[in-house]
Amino acid sequence: MLQFFIMNKSNHSNILIIGGGCAGISVASRLKSLKSDLTISVIEPSDKSLYQAAWTLVGAGAYEKANTIKPMSSVMPNYVNWIKSYAESFLPESNTVKTSNEEYTYDYLVVCPGLKLNFDGVAGLKESLGKNNVCTNYDADMAVYTWECLKNLEGGNLLFTEPPMP
């Protein structure tokens, strides 16, 4: 059974979530539906919400890139305390997360900051993307290019790669 503690501190939340993407917002919504009196804070620096899952549809020509980008304020639930900053360090021994100018405490911490792409991890990939039919759906602009390449495909072999799961 989950136990929560009330503290007289404005920077304290029952649930502190790092990351305001699909995972962070889904977790916030699910937990709030299970226990409506939870205090939930989300540390998310971005003004934009990127619906990355739809980029495969953009790359297939079935969805518009513009529909995958929305103001963060339009998707962040109104019951969430949105902390518009980066999490800079974790202090688990004191249930604390530090940002550049503040400390936040929590009863439970959820860490889902999203992907950090590393196109430099494959020799020559970064320089090749966006030309000569080298595409990726891990970037909204490149997903548009994927569709351009597929529309103009006249034959040949296609090579698809998928990174292994951790």
Explain the meaning of each model-derived region.
Residues 2-13, 81-165:
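FAD-binding core/adjacent interface of flavoenzyme oxidoreductases
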